[in-house]
Structures are given as structure tokens and as C-alpha cells.
Amino acid sequence: MAHILIQNHPILTFEDEPFIDKYWNAGLSEFIISKHGYITTYDHNEVEEILLSCFEYFVDQFRTLILQQDTEIFFHYVFLLHEASIDLYIEQLKGLQLPDDIDSDFPRYCRILKLILEQSCDIELTAKRSIGYQKALNIMQELYYLGNWIYEFSIYTAYHKMIPSAYFVEFEENVFTCRWQNNYGELNKLLLKYFSIDYETFFDEAALDELKQAIEDNFFIDYKKAIGQIPIIKKHFSNRQNQTIEPYVLPINLAAECNTSEDNTWLFYSGLMITKANKLSIEDTVLKPHSEKRYIFRPMLTYIVDDVERSLVGDNKVAESMMVIASNTIHWNTMPEEWLQNKGMVKFMNKKGLEHDRLLENEIEKIFITNKFPYCRNTKSFKQKNGKSNVKVDIQGLGEIDFIVVNKDRKKIFISDTKYNRARYDAVGYRTDYTNFGGYEMKIEAKKNWLSKNLQVLQEHLEVMFHIDYGILDFEVEAIFFINTPTFYMFNGKYKAITLTRIKEYVEGSWDYPTIKLKDDSNKQFLYYTHPYFSKAPTATAFE
């Protein structure tokens, strides 16, 4: 079952069996033996080196196979599968439930199709030779297998860099194996499932419309005409989804249509193109998932066919890319680098970059107001009684405090920094956050230590601002992070990170990070993991 239809949309299923002997039992195993020896090791550094070698092996196999594909029609077959994947995603948003085995693989399947398509930009293609669909299908299936293991080992490596001694490696009957240590795989799986609901959070709904308006204002174009001419030109030649166009005509036509310069229109379109000049290597595509030089952000796949530059643009791909740019780049001061040559677009990006923390903070503030928690927001100084000067904290070594919130009943004060992070869905992205939080920890710790020693300052501030009639000098101070979307730091950070959906319950004390119970059959005991889950040894009780 390699190729099926779901609501008339074709999709590949992941298949191990045709390739496991070639690429794993023989290929990878022999490669690791030749490079590292016939080894069993639990040593963290040795395991990391071997995981990186596995990643390298599958990248090389993927690259070798794809560089052999020099027919344009092969990449058109992949393109049509990718178009179908976008259609299926749209159906999912409307409520379509994919079969469980398809649903779990679907996000990675879409990434691998994009990875394959991006490589076409590196290859001198020809339309003068063809390839049969079944043969192309077999190659696509093989690339899907290889791409899956590229992503898998990138994830293994990322987790291993975040968790001390996450994995061990060994050989079983001359076949290489890699496994989690300490039940971490099952633990991580349960945590991801438990916190999956936390992805259902708010986003900047106005960002897409604002982006389109900024494009019109700064490139002096009509956005609908800019995008609308692409299907018109395609249909002039044929009604095929995979009809290509010559990209040079787009800025010329739009400049004439909008009475603006071709410099403006060329900058706009070049920011939407992925080409040989700007595409990433296979390694960087996988390890830098938020780079703007990827097909997810650049919908115009541009390559050379028989010495002519052509662009392949999907019917729904521009809309997908614009949504991703609006939701997952501009708030983090990123956009297509060509657009950064336009001062107005830079100004727009900087404005959105300054807004994103405020958007999250506004939502958090609503929670505190609704639940009548005394709180301070964006505090740079504390008001004092009896005419005393304010106490400043926006100084070197401390800095503005995003939130302080008080729960009288629990005799607890929470001091928090707010982090509006990109949405992350695998360990490669999580690791970026994990590294960043190392710096955030030092800052929030300094603020917590200061506040713990200066509760009288906060006491007077709250009396002035909220007229509280109770003392807080014996309250416990807890440092936490408020975040918009789940990330691995939540599970293993020094300080707890609370998503928007759980802030109310955490502050009021009705929810906390759960204890995870796992069964250890080999030692006939139950293991109990608590936060931080991957840093503390679990407690154990024997089977009854």
C-alpha cells in the first residue's frame, strides 16, 4: 500500500519493507561499523557522534538518489502530490479525519515532499526525456523512506543534545540499533500527548491582512493582481496544475498594470522565489526549519529546464506561504531577505516584532482581570507610600518585569517573563527554544532574587495600586515563564513554563505539571516522574 487516494487526493504511505535491508540492515550498519566500529555505548558524546553519522549517511543517500533525477516530469509528479497534500490539509481544517497511520506521518510527509522539490533547483532539468509514473512512484517512495530517516536522526540528535544520555546504541546480530534510555521515549510521548491541547492558542489574526497591505503600500502594487496573474498566465497555456511559467514576465506585467517600477515588482516576486541561488542544502533545510529560504515560505519553485528558467507555482501554495510568513516569521523580525531591501517593509516588520509580546501579554492580563488577581504588568518601577520615590528595577542586572501576580489564598507571588515563541512541532525546533531559555533563566532568577529580598517594596506598591489590606512579606516567590505555545523546555526547564491555556489554573492552584507513572516490567516496579522530568531520577514502588 504505497499509493492511495483519500477523497480523490493521492498520497504516499510510508513503507519500510522495500528499503530496510538496503539502507539499514546493510547500508547504515556497515557505514557505522566502518566509521565507529562494532560498538555498544551509553557514553553521551560517543552516542552523539554516532547519531550525527547516521544523519550524514541518510543525507548522502538521499542526495545521491535525487541528483540522478534530471527529468522535469519527475518533479512534476512530486509537485502534484504536494498540491494534493495542501488540499488534504485544507480538508483537515474543515474537519476531515485522516486514518491514524496516515495522520501521524502526514506532517513529515509534507516536509519531505517540500525537501524533494527544493532540490530540483540544483539540477539541470530536461523536458526532452520522460519517466513513467510507476518508476517515478518507486523513486518517490524511496526518497520518502530516506527523508523520513533524515528527519528522524535530526530529532534523535536534538533530543540527545537537550537530555543528558538520552540514547544508547548497539548492534544486534550485526544490525545497528538506537534506543532511548531510562524510559525517556515513553515519557516524552505521554508528555507530548498530554500537552497537545496547549497548541490551541491565540494568534495574530490581523497579521495576514496587514502583511498584504504593507506589500501594497511599500511595493506600490495591487496584491490581488500580483498573485492573480499567475493562474491567468498558466491557463493561457493549459489547465494543468503543473503548468510552469517563465518568471521574468511577472514583474514586467505587474509594473505595467500598477504603474510602478520593475525594481519594485521584481523585489516582490523574488522574495517569493526559491532558486538555485538561495536554496539551502539538504542538511540546513532540515536543521534550520524556520529559515525563510525554504519552500514553505517561498511558493515559486524556480529551476532551469533545457536552459530556460521556469517557475512551478501551485494553486494554493501562495496562500499557504503568505499565511506562514504572516504567522511565523514577521513577529520574529524575519521575512524574505529580498523584501528587506525595501525600507517600508523593514519598518513594518520591526513594528510587528515589537507587537508580538504585547499581544500575548494582553491575553494574559485579561485572565488576571477576570479572576481578580492583583498583578503588575511591564513594571519598570514600584510606587511607594508616604511620598517616597519610586523604586526602579529597569536597571542593569534586573530589567523590566513582565508580570507579578499575587494569590492571597495560596500565599504565593509569581514573577514571570513572557515569551512569545514560534510554533514548534519537533525536537529540532524545540532545541532552539531550549538554548534560548538558558539565557532567560539567568534573567528571571535575578529578578526573583531581588523581589524575594524586597517584598516590602512590592507590599507598598500593591497597597497604592490595588489597596490590598493584607501582608505579603511571608509569601513564597516563584519564578515562572508565560508562553504562547508548547516547547520542550516546559518538560525539563529549571523554571516552569505555563502556556496561555493553563495560566489561570496554575496561578489559582487547581493545576500543576502531572506526575507521570510508567511501568518497568524488567524490574517489576512502577516509576514516577515529576517536573523537571528528564533531570530528576524517578521514584519507584514495587508491583503489588
Where are these regions (language model features)?
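A structural signal for isolated positions on well-ordered beta-strands in alpha/beta enzyme cores
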Residues: D402, F414, E478-I480
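Composition-driven low-complexity segments enriched in polar/acidic and proline residues
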Residues: M1-K351, F481-E544
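Catalytic cores of nucleic-acid endonucleases
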Residues: Y420-F482
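Active-site metal-binding core of divalent-cation-utilizing nuclease and nuclease-like domains
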Residues: R377-I401, V405-R410
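Short, solvent-exposed loop/turn segments at secondary-structure junctions
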Residues: F382-Q384, N421, T485-F488
